[in-house]
């Protein structure tokens, strides 16, 4: 039972790190990537639909995204959604595709993005620590119900702590890499 608690904690921590990585993919780092538009939703016949479900997004150049909608009638809505999304890019529409030219980041914008990366990093670390707390609570219940001994409890909580430390180290490494990418001119 205790091994199962630790295994579940590991899986949850892995998911938290993956979610953090996905979150960072939406942070613009001066280069074009389709992940920038992941959170942009378009009002498509009354339903908020992610833009990547309504169009093909390609990266023909390092600083350009091309959005080719499957349905040309939503091109204006897509343009509005991109403008409203606070990505800091202005779409240009030629009737059949939308082009997004990603401007080089200003020093100020780089610092803002670095702060955002730190914020996401902190949220991910808190999520991992909450998982640790839940796992430790679960292990304490097992000890209270005499399913494991006090020594086993100590051993298992140490194992959970090692898991936590390794996942936080992963988050720190990912954060450092993304900050470097954001601050790169």
UniProtKB/Swiss-Prot annotation:
Subcellular compartments: Cytoplasm
Example of a GO cellular component annotation carried by this entry: cytoplasm
Keyword Cytoplasm: yes
Record key words, sorted: Cytoplasm, Protein biosynthesis
GO annotation terms (biological process): translational termination
GO molecular function terms attached to this record: ribosomal large subunit binding
CDD domains assigned: RRF
InterPro entries, per the entry: Ribosome_recyc_fac, Ribosome_recyc_fac_dom, RRF_sf
Main location: cytoplasm
Its biological purpose: Responsible for the release of ribosomes from messenger RNA at the termination of protein biosynthesis. May increase the efficiency of translation by recycling ribosomes from one round of translation to another.
Family indicated by similarity: Belongs to the RRF family.
Full protein name: Ribosome-recycling factor
Protein's organism: Geobacillus thermodenitrificans (strain NG80-2)
Organism taxonomic ancestry: Bacteria, Bacillati, Bacillota, Bacilli, Bacillales
């Amino acid at each position: 039972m205790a091994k199962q608690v630790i295994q579940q904690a590991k899986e949850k921590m892995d998911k938290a790190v993956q979610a953090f990585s996905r979150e960072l993919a939406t942070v613009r780092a001066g280069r074009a990537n389709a992940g920038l538009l992941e959170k942009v939703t378009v009002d498509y016949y009354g339903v908020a639909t992610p833009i990547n479900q309504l169009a093909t997004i390609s990266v023909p150049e390092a600083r350009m995204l091309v959005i080719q909608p499957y349905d040309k009638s939503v091109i204006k809505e897509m343009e509005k959604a991109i403008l409203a999304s606070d990505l800091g890019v202005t779409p240009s529409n030629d009737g059949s595709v939308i082009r997004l030219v990603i401007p080089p980041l200003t020093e100020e914008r780089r610092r803002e993005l670095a702060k955002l990366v730190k914020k996401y990093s902190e949220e991910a670390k808190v999520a991992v620590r909450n998982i640790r707390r839940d796992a430790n609570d679960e292990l304490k219940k097992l000890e209270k119900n005499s399913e494991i001994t006090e020594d086993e409890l100590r051993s298992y909580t140490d194992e959970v702590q090692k898991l936590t430390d390794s996942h936080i180290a992963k988050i720190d490494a990912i954060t450092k890499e993304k900050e470097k990418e954001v601050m790169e001119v």
